[in-house]
Each structure stands twice: as C-alpha cells, then as structure tokens.
C-alpha cells in the first residue's frame, strides 16, 4: 500500500546524541541498541497503525508524532531506519461503522486511509518504508498461524460451525513480561479491549484469536484450517517479523495497546520463531484528553487534524501543542494548548529574524539534541528554544531569517519537524 511523500529533513552540523528511550517491559530508560552509525544495517521500527474508520484524530496524531521524533533523532545519529506500519483494514470496528453509516466497509476504509495519508503529510511525519494493510498480509498470517499450530502453540476449537483458531496463553513462559500487569488487570483489559473470554471451547479464557472462521456477511479467505480472516494481534506479528526479522529494535504504539495487543503480538512472534523478545525496546505514547475528558470515539469528543488545518491552524503549531507535554504521559488538549503553540511559533520566528550570536545558536542546537535524545524530553527542548528566543532583541529584526537564525531554524525543522 502506498504511504505518503517524505518531507525534506535538513542535515545538521555538530555532534548528535545517542537516543535513550523508556522500555515498557523493563520499566526503565535505557540506550536504544542500534547498528553502528553509518552502517548499511537499518534500525528496525514497527508502529501499529490505524483501523480506518475515524482518521485522524489528535490521539492518533500524538502517537505518530512521538515515533516521528524517534525517526528524526535516529537520522540525526546517521542511522538508516526501516520503519514499518500496518493498517487494520479488515476488523469488526470497521464493519460496524460501515453498517452504521450505510456504506461498504471497503469504501469507508479507502476514504479514511486517504484522509490519514493527507494528515500525516500535512504534519510532516516521515512515512514508513513499508505501509501494509492486513488484507495484503493474509498469506503471511496464514503461514504464521500454521507454524503456531505445528508447534503446538495454537489449537482449533471444537466447534463444527465456527472452528476458530486460538493461541495458547501458555505458549511462552514469559507471557506478561511486556505489560508487567498482574493477572486481574490482564483479564480486565482482555475483556474490555476486543478479547472473548467467554467463548466456549477455549482452553483458557485469555487465549487469543488467531483465525476467525468464516461467518455470514463477513469477508473471508481460504486457508489450510478453513476459510476465515485474521485475528487482530497476529496481523502485526506477521507484518513486523516478515519485514524486520524475528527480533527487531523498536515496537511501538499508544499505551492503550500495551495489553492485550502488544503483549499478544510479541507472544505470537516469540512462540513462532523461538526468540527471547520480539523487540529490544517496547515504546508507548500516552493518551490525549480534551478539556480534561478522555478523547474517545464513544464519547464523540474527538479533535481531528483535518478540522484543525481546515480552520487555518498551522501543522507546526499542532506539533508544538502536542510536544508541550511529555509523550509518555496522558496529555490534555484544549483551545489554550493551540493558542500557546501558535504564540510560541510566532516568537521563534521573530527571534530567527533577529539572531546574530552564533555561539548561542549552536548551544541551543546542542540543547535540542540533548533533550530529545533523553527519552524525547520535548518540554525541555521547547523550553531551550524559548530561552534562546527570549534573549534576542527582536526590535530590529528583518523579514528574512538571519544566517545565525537559520542554524536554529534548521535544527527545529530536522529534530522537531516544525517549519518556521
């Protein structure tokens, strides 16, 4: 599937800072293990994509902006990045929304994917190298399910009408290591987030669906274990490991995906391929609320990127509004967030038109690198530029950025993805 155009990312002079990120599994900030800088071996990064029926709300955008920062810092450190993202273009929520709106689910998916692409392009988010729909990966999923069945890590329920295939929660002895949740929390989230603990015939209530046997009115594909369609988690396991290898560098997404989705995606891959960890780093971005209320489809309080840009708000201001708080925390978005970001953007531009002190400009670039490489400390990075701008007399500024100002302008573009 086609992604979207790649924004130009300026190359910066000076010394980059190696990236450290919080790992959800280990519960600590540590250095991201990467191939040597400048080598032909890329950093492998997989980020879960959208289910295309409500694109692109600010919660989506905040997650992809966090991983865009990671991509940019890796580029600054002279790493190539093999970024993979999926699209869950065959799933129950998509079917339900299409039925509600009286449209074909394929048409709804196509329109929302196109909107998502345009929003990502507007926000200057670097696209994935591989942008893969679940439908495109059916053969890969079938092969992985077959492997899990052959390994005894999966089973077919005894149900003549709907012989679904499930993964055994006991297939690996480390289940739960990524989320660090206790059994009660896992059971609660499994039931709330797409699981089917009461499905008759399962060996364990938390065994995860790998292959849903064909039902009337649903799309299905032939397989050695009967016609059907993929479960949610196995799609990501197959798409990621078939492109990045059985164990890769970074798996990420929103914090609501930690369990069950990411826990099971990792467990399926580890059981199928016999690896210790699917990813060396598990990275998760917090949720977005609006005016103190969790932003969600069910509440109908979603803020959409396309609405903000259509209203004349600059993508750079949207980025700065999201970056005002740390990516791992749950953040609130309101009119003040956007107004503050727009004022910040204007202040930085004024400073770049009047800056003359080269040493100060070089220093703020160093500070940007240091803050962003320290687990994406965007509040610190923004404060560093604020402090630089506050020290500049802008009364005699010109209409164009000064030579010195362009040093900072390039760094803000390259590292924060914000064009002044």
Curated annotation (Swiss-Prot):
Motif 'HIGH' region per UniProt: ranges: 50-60
One CC-aspect GO term: cytosol
Transmembrane stretches, start-end: none
Protein EC: 6.3.1.13
GO MF term list: ATP binding; cysteine-glucosaminylinositol ligase activity; cysteine-tRNA ligase activity; zinc ion binding
The protein's enzyme class: ligase
Sequence motif 'KMSKS' region, residues: 294-298
Cofactor binding note of this UniProt entry: Binds 1 zinc ion per subunit.
Motif ('ERGGDP' region): 192-197
UniProt catalytic activity: 1D-myo-inositol 2-amino-2-deoxy-alpha-D-glucopyranoside + L-cysteine + ATP = 1D-myo-inositol 2-(L-cysteinylamino)-2-deoxy-alpha-D-glucopyranoside + AMP + diphosphate + H(+)
Biological process per Gene Ontology, one example term: mycothiol biosynthetic process
Keywords, in A-Z order: ATP-binding, Ligase, Metal-binding, Nucleotide-binding, Zinc
Self-association and partners: Monomer.
Protein task: Catalyzes the ATP-dependent condensation of GlcN-Ins and L-cysteine to form L-Cys-GlcN-Ins.
NCBIfam families xrefs: mycothiol_MshC (TIGR03447)
Name of the protein in question: L-cysteine:1D-myo-inositol 2-amino-2-deoxy-alpha-D-glucopyranoside ligase
Gene: mshC
């Amino acid at each position: 599937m086609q992604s979207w155009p790649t924004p130009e990312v300026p190359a910066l002079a000076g010394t980059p800072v190696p990236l450290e990120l919080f790992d959800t599994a280990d519960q600590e900030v540590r250095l991201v293990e990467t191939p040597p800088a400048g080598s032909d071996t890329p950093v492998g990064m997989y980020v879960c994509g959208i289910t295309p029926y409500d694109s692109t709300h600010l919660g989506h955008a905040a997650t992809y902006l966090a991983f865009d920062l990671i991509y940019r810092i890796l580029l600054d450190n002279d790493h190539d990045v093999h970024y993979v993202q999926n699209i869950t273009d065959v799933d129950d929520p998509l079917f339900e929304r299409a039925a509600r709106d009286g449209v074909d689910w394929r048409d709804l998916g196509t329109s929302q994917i196109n909107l998502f692409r345009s929003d990502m392009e507007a926000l200057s988010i670097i696209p994935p190298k591989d942008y893969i729909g679940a439908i495109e990966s059916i053969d890969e999923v079938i092969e992985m399910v077959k492997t899990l069945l052959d390994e005894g890590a999966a089973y077919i329920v005894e149900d003549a009408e709907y012989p679904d295939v499930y993964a055994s929660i006991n297939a690996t002895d480390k289940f739960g290591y990524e989320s660090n949740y206790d059994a009660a929390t896992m059971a609660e989230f499994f039931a709330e987030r797409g699981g089917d603990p009461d499905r008759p015939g399962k060996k364990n209530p938390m065994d995860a669906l790998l292959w849903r046997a064909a039902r009337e009115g649903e799309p299905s594909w032939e397989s050695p274990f009967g016609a059907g369609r993929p479960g949610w988690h196995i799609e990501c396991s197959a798409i990621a490991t078939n492109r990045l290898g059985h164990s890769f560098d970074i798996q990420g997404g929103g914090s609501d995906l930690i369990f069950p989705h990411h826990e099971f995606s990792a467990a399926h891959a580890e059981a199928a391929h016999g690896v210790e960890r699917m990813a060396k780093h598990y990275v998760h971005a917090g949720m977005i609320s609006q005016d103190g209320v969790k932003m969600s489809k069910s509440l109908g309080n979603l803020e959409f990127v396309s609405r903000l840009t259509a209203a004349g708000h600059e993508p750079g201001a949207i980025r700065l509004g999201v970056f005002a708080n740390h990516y791992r925390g749950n953040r609130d978005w309101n009119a003040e967030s956007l107004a503050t970001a727009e004022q910040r953007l204007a202040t930085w531009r004024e400073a770049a038109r009047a800056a003359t002190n080269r040493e100060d400009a070089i220093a703020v670039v160093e500070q940007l690198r240091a803050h962003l490489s320290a687990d994406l400390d965007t509040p610190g990075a923004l404060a560093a530029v604020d402090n630089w701008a506050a020290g500049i007399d802008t009364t005699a500024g010109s209409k164009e950025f000064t030579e010195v100002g362009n040093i900072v302008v390039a760094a803000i573009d390259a590292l924060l993805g914000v064009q002044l």
